Every structure is written in C-alpha cells, then in structure tokens.
Regions:
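NUDIX/MutT-family hydrolases
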Residues: 177-216
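N-terminal leader/linker segments that precede catalytic domains of diphosphate-processing enzymes
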Residues: 1-114, 119-136, 140-173, 215-256
C-alpha cells in the first residue's frame, strides 16, 4: 500500500539542480525564439519591467534565512500553510533566478516577494528598464547583450502592466542589494520550479480566476511574481512555448 505522506513528500522534492551552462542558455534562447509574446495595451495602466535574472549558485549556500514570518503574517495566504514559515532557505543550487524580499519600509507591497524591477521611464524599453532596475536594486550592472528575450505582459490588480525580461547574468555575479528597496536577496535554483507539486491553484470567493501558488522554500509565491515564474518554467525550461498565464489571479493581499 502506498504511503500518502511519502507520496506528498516525494512530490514536493525538487529534481536535481540544472547546470548553469551554455547549453541551458541556448535552450532558453531557442524556446523564447519560438514563443509568440503577447503584449498588452497600457490603456491607462502604468508600465513596469522585471528581470528574471539567471545566475549560478552552490547547493547549501543558503542554509539559513533570518527573515521568518509570524503565524499571523502567514494567515493571509489563501491556502493551508501548515509547515510553512515564510523563510527562503535550502533552495540554492545550479542555475538560479534572483528573488527579492521587498523592504519592510516601502509604501506598497512591503516585505512581499518580487523579482528585480520597477517602472519603465520615459524613452526606455522594457529591457533597458529591467537592466537599470537590476543595477539599482541588487547591484548587478549588465550590458544589453545579457538579455535573452521577453515573456508575456501581465496585468496586475494594482494598475500595472508588467513585462518580464529574461536576463543571463553570468557565472560570477555578486549580488549587492540596495537596503532602501530590498530587505534580502536569494538565489533560487530553477529546478525548484520543476517540482511535481508546482504550480498549484486555489480558489477565492472574490474572483472566478484561479489563484496561482509556486511552492518555494518555506513559502508560497503568488502572482504577479508567481505567474511570471510559472510561464518562465513552461516556456523557457519545458519548451511549452504556447502556454499563457494572464488569467492567473493574485491573492487579495496583493491587490492594493
């Protein structure tokens, strides 16, 4: 007889880390080249760009995370959070993306998970804005040639259209987070996105759209960041270039 607890543990166990290699880079470039990106009209929305910043990392280099959420803070998540504490530890290894915990002192979305990024300035392209924000937020300055491509725009409840830009930073990059904007920065192995239990979906009474959740470390990453990471997995890692995430809902706590 199968042990349900064993099956659940197996489904949450990520595959082995992926090598940060030219082979992976070229595979991502090829998949993005076959992806027909969907851009959304602004129609009064503010335009922002984020970087899915791909770096290398060592297994075990993130053995602890001092920023633990309280049970009250975790209670706003529309899901069973048993065993979760909001920490991002034990997720590094191989090809990774950079995930930020926003500063607690910010006026909006304080302490929430985010990718490096921000508003697109007048005259900037999404790629230029993503590179600028990467420099400003995590101290990584990269040339335009580091950009591999873009994924679909995502419209947020707070009035933004977000353009995700996939960026290859190189194997020796040093992260230097700006404390005014970023409380902590993490290298999360992209293999964590390939877990059998990821992504997962829940329903909420406030919307008929499914709320997407990406299990990472001791937390669940929600849209918009979660939606962008899901499309990155499907398109760039799995090669499922026609998959879309525009209909994935955000949790109510992220609507403001």
């Amino acid at each position: 007889m199968k042990d349900p607890a064993h099956d659940a543990a197996a489904s949450s166990r990520p595959p082995s880390p992926l090598d940060y290699s030219d082979t992976l880079r070229q595979s991502i470039v090829d998949h993005l080249g076959r992806h027909e990106r969907r851009a959304l009209p602004l129609e009064g929305h503010r335009h922002a760009a984020v970087a899915i910043l791909l770096v290398d990392s060592e297994v075990g280099s993130d053995g602890d995370d001092a920023f633990k959420f309280t049970a009250e803070q975790m209670s706003i998540i529309p899901s069973d959070v048993t065993g979760l504490d909001g920490r991002m530890a034990g997720v590094a290894g191989g090809a990774s993306f950079v995930l930020c915990r926003r500063s607690a002192g910010l006026n909006s979305h304080a302490s929430q998970w985010a990718l490096p990024g921000g508003r697109i300035d007048a005259g900037e392209t999404a790629a230029e804005a993503a590179l600028r924000e990467t420099d400003e937020e995590v101290g990584v300055r990269l040339p335009a040639s580091a950009v591999l491509g873009e994924l679909d725009d995502y419209q947020t409840r707070s009035g933004y259209i977000i353009t995700p830009v996939v960026v290859w930073a190189g194997p020796t990059v040093e992260l230097r987070p700006n404390p005014d904007e970023v409380l902590a920065v993490y290298r999360v192995g992209v293999h964590e996105l390939l877990r059998e239990d990821s992504p997962r979906f829940v329903t909420i009474p406030e919307s008929d759209r499914p709320v997407v959740q990406v299990p990472l470390g001791g937390d669940l990453i929600h849209a918009p960041t979660g939606a962008l990471l899901v499309q990155f997995r499907w398109v760039c890692l799995d090669g499922r270039v026609d998959e879309r995430v525009a209909d994935f809902e955000q949790p109510v706590f992220a609507w403001g």
